[in-house]
Amino acid sequence: MRRAPPTAAAFLPSTLTLPTLRNAAASCTGCDLYKNATQTVFGEEPARATLLLVGEQPGDQEDVAGHPFVGPAGRVLDKALKEAGIARNQVYVTNAVKHFKWEPQGKRRKHKKPSAAEVAACR
């Protein structure tokens, strides 16, 4: 028998606002990514942003800090936004999944690509 793909549907609040979705994501166990992550990394900045940027997943530094795009990818993003004349606080930044997927590599946590099912669970 085939196992149903993971889903976060059971964790969706009845009222879909950024604050209620943030709270729901913080307690989501809809897929296994939450098990090894330090915390949920939800999207940030203005609710009515003119630009939305979606990354693959939080990285090691984002997992520790609890904020998206604060590590190396965030520095590249900040530089690109500055060159384009776009203020970071005008951009809503988030990731396709809200937990850092990794595998140990010595003392480091090495990024591991989330599966299509994990991404689908986080939609």
Describe each PLM feature range.
Residues M1-R123:
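A polyanion-binding, active-site-adjacent surface
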